[in-house]
Amino acid sequence: MQNEYSQFEQRKRDHIELALMPANQSSELNPFDHFSLVHEALPDLDFKDISIQSIRFNKPVEKPFIISSMTAGHSNAIEINYRLMEACSKTKWAMGVGSQRRELTDKQAAFEWEPLRRDFPMVSLFSNLGIAQLIDTPISAIQRLIDTLHAEALIIHCNPLQECIQPEGTTNFHGCWAALEALVKKINSPVIVKETGCGFSKNTLLRLNNIGVAAVDVSGVGGTHWGRIEGHRADKDPIRHRTADTFRNWGIDTLQSTHNAISLNPSFEIWGSGGVRNGLDAAKLFALGATTVGFAKPMLEAALDSTDQVLTQMNTIEYELKTAMFCTGSLVLDDLKEKACP
């Protein structure tokens, strides 16, 4: 078991390093440059009156942003997550934690969050578990993950391509829909289903709507591509390495995934992430109908430096969003829905 934990920690450290490599970014497939907002030369409003308040789980939130789930369960993660949570405590951003998979078998792993929760009790956190682990885990154990973290909700992440390429991947997803439906019915928290960079089809989103998930984070192609990351890790496995190259552009982009969701007029909230790099990208997702927008790589890069760098990144994104709103004559986020170029 100890050897398994050591491999887990090394994998997570690899992920941090590889996620920052330009070769593992599907930026050439990023759709945001092909989508525009209508410029308003005479916006009849005062910049300081612009509100970026949104709704999350039927409650108003001051900021519509979340730091997308990134890393947990290893020593390097503690300082990274401390800086992220410290910044969130000052900006009122929400945060998804890295996978809590290790906490299911290692009780000590849960202690990673205790000092962070003690220092930053007001930060809105979301628990996180992979769909493959959901299938085999009792709901009572998942509820403990949420309760221990004092989390607002639970993210279930879906990563089929990553699992196929990852040398240690778990590729048995049989029973995932039944497990997800049971979770939604029995868990005492909102459930968010999230991709990890490959997006969602309309048919999958329709099924998610039918089982009653609270939100879907579309996380489409355009940012960090986990198939490419695992391909680098599988450099000594010629089959997986070649497969990673074959599927280097696999997935549905973030804007198309968001459009797929909007077209259903779903009961779930639509969260946008995947290649979102600035406040203008975020504005375009809000214009499509997203209510929350997530950032991962920009925050990871900043957190590797300092809390101040994370705060600078957050404040810049907020200012960019408000600039997009001012230059389209949008006083509130909903106004952006009328400002998308046809």
Curated annotation (Swiss-Prot):
It catalyses: isopentenyl diphosphate = dimethylallyl diphosphate. InterPro entries: Aldolase_TIM, FMN-dep_DH, IPdP_isomerase. It is an enzyme of class 5 (isomerase). GO terms for molecular function: FMN binding; isopentenyl-diphosphate delta-isomerase activity; magnesium ion binding; NADPH binding; oxidoreductase activity. FMN binds at residues 68-71, 99, 128, 194, 219, 224, 275-277, 296-297. SUPFAM superfamilies: FMN-linked oxidoreductases. Pfam families: FMN_dh. Its cofactor is FMN; NADPH; Mg(2+). Keywords: Cytoplasm, Flavoprotein, FMN, Isomerase, Isoprene biosynthesis, Magnesium, Metal-binding, NADP. It is found in: Cytoplasm. Substrate binds at residues 11-12, 99-101, 162. Mg(2+) binds at residue 163. HAMAP family: Idi_2. NCBIfam families: IPP_isom_2 (TIGR02151). Belongs to the IPP isomerase type 2 family. This is Isopentenyl-diphosphate delta-isomerase.
